[in-house]
Amino acid sequence: MKKFDPAVYKKRKCECLDKCFQAFMDNGLENTGLQLLCKYCGFKTNQALYHYFESKDMIITESVQYAMIKFEREFMKKAPRSRADLKNYLEKFPRWMQKNYGEHMRFVYQVYTSPKYKKQGYDFFSGIPKRYDTFIHHIAKNLDVSFESIQALYYLYITSTLQFALFKDEVYLDVEVNAI
């Protein structure tokens, strides 16, 4: 019998979260059952999926949270490293984000605005200010400005970027980016 390895378990669960998120994106929540999730994950039986998750609802919420954390990391990797990078970042990043993550963001929005998953959405989003503030401290250091001078502007930028990713509203984006 194989010995339980927490690192292998975590790695495999993360792979499942990625694949399950993709299954939901490809097929929608209603059209994605456990058999289809197993197929995406390469499992032969539902039991293998239950090794990692207690229910389909848990798969939905954990895969969305996992995707959002990955998105946040990507968002943070693209941050300006100097003042010279700032204009390019402000102008180009929202469009890159919409192109690469627009569908993901619409799906996340769909899940977290559903009455069924509203609490999980609140729980997840309640941690965002702390994560973003940590990120903004990093950007402030890179740009040699105070945290206080850019915090509100960066929150506005993040909101504008997400709004654009969801709805492709160029006017809203341009007005807010120009204000920043």
Regions found by a protein language model. Give the residues of each.
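N-terminal intrinsically disordered/low-complexity leader segments
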Residues: 1-10
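Hydrophobic alpha-helical connector segments
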Residues: 62, 75-101, 146-147, 154
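Helix-turn-helix
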Residues: 23-58, 62
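Hydrophobic/aromatic-rich alpha-helical bundle segments in the mid-to-C-terminal region
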Residues: 125-126, 139-180
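Amphipathic alpha-helical packing segments from all-alpha helical-bundle domains
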Residues: 72, 76, 117-147, 151
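Hydrophobic/aromatic residues within well-ordered alpha-helical segments
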Residues: 12, 56, 63, 67, ...
